[in-house]
C-alpha cells in the first residue's frame, strides 16, 4: 500500500518511532518479496499514497498521531500539481521499490489524507477492475493499514493482511502501535498471513 522514505527509511522522520518494528519484522525486505511475487504472478498492484500539502497545514484540529504527522511534515509535498522536490524526499518511494511502482502497470490512486481510503479513489479503482479480494501491506500498521482494512471490509471486500510486511510506532506514552494493530487484524481481517505464506500462494 504505502512505502515511503518518511515511514520506512532510516533517514525518515518517523524512524525513531517505527525503526525497531521495521527491523524486527524485516518489513523492507518482506515488502520487496511481495512486490516481486505479485509482479511475477501477474497480480494487480495498487498504491494508496499519503500526501500532505501546504494547505493541509491550516487544519485546526486532529488526533495525536495526526498532529505529529503535520508538525513533522511527514509525506509532505510543496505543491499538489508539481513533482518538483518529490524525488528522494520523505514523500517519495524507497528506491528499491521504484521499479515495481513505476513499471507502467501499478495503479497509484489519488492520495488519502488522514488514515483511510475514504478520501481517495482506491475503492473505485478496485471495483472498476472487478477485484473483490485484497492483500494488504505497507505502513503504518495501526494507522493507515488498519484504517484501510476496516474501510475495505465495510465496502464488502475480502481482505488478508500480511502482518510482517508492515510495522508500527512504539511511543513511550501512546503504546505499541504494531501490537495493537495485530490484535485488531485478527478480529477484523478475513486472513492474517506472513509474507512467506502469501508468496507461496502467489507462485
Predicted regions, residues:
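Catalytic-core segment of enzymes that process non-peptidic bonds
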Residues: 47-56, 62-63
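Short beta-strand segments at enzyme active-site cores
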Residues: 43-50, 162
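Short, conserved micro-motifs enriched in small and acidic residues
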Residues: 21, 25-28, 143
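Active-site-adjacent betaalpha module
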Residues: 8, 36-41, 58-59, 64-203
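Basic, amphipathic juxtamembrane/active-site segments
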Residues: 9-24
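Short acidic, Gly/Ser-rich segments with clustered Asp/Glu that frequently serve as metal-coordination loops
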Residues: 1-7
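Ser/Thr-centric signal marking residues that sit
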Residues: 27, 48, 166
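A short, N-terminal amphipathic alpha-helix
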Residues: 25-44
Amino acid at each position: 500500500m504505502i512505502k515511503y522514505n518518511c515511514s520506512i527509511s532510516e533517514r525518515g522522520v518517523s524512524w525513531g518511532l517505527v525503526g525497531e518494528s521495521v527491523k524486527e519484522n524485516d518489513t523492507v525486505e518482506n515488502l520487496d518479496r511481495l512486490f516481486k511475487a505479485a509482479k511475477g504472478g501477474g497480480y494487480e498492484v495498487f498504491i494508496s499514497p499519503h500526501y500532505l500539502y501546504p494547505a493541509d497545514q491550516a487544519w485546526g484540529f486532529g488526533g495525536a498521531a495526526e498532529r505529529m504527522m503535520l508538525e513533522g511534515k511527514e509525506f509532505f509535498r510543496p505543491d499538489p500539481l508539481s513533482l518538483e522536490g518529490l524525488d528522494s524526499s520523505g514523500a517519495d518511494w524507497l528506491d528499491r521499490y521504484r521499479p515495481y511502482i513505476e513499471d507502467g502497470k501499478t495503479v497509484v490512486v489519488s492520495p488519502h489524507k488522514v488514515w483511510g481510503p475514504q478520501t481517495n479513489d482506491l475503492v473505485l479503482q478496485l471495483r472498476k477492475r472487478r477485484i473483490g479480494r485484497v492483500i494488504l501491506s505497507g505502513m503504518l500498521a495501526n494507522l493507515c493499514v488498519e484504517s484501510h482494512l476496516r474501510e475495505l471490509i465495510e465496502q464488502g471486500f475480502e481482505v488478508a493482511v500480511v502482518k510482517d510486511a508492515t510495522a508500527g510506532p512504539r511511543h513511550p506514552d501512546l503504546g505499541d502501535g504494531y501490537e495493537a494493530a495485530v490484535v485488531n487484524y485478527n478480529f477484523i481481517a478475513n486472513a492474517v498471513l506472513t509474507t512467506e505464506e502469501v508468496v507461496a500462494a502467489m507462485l
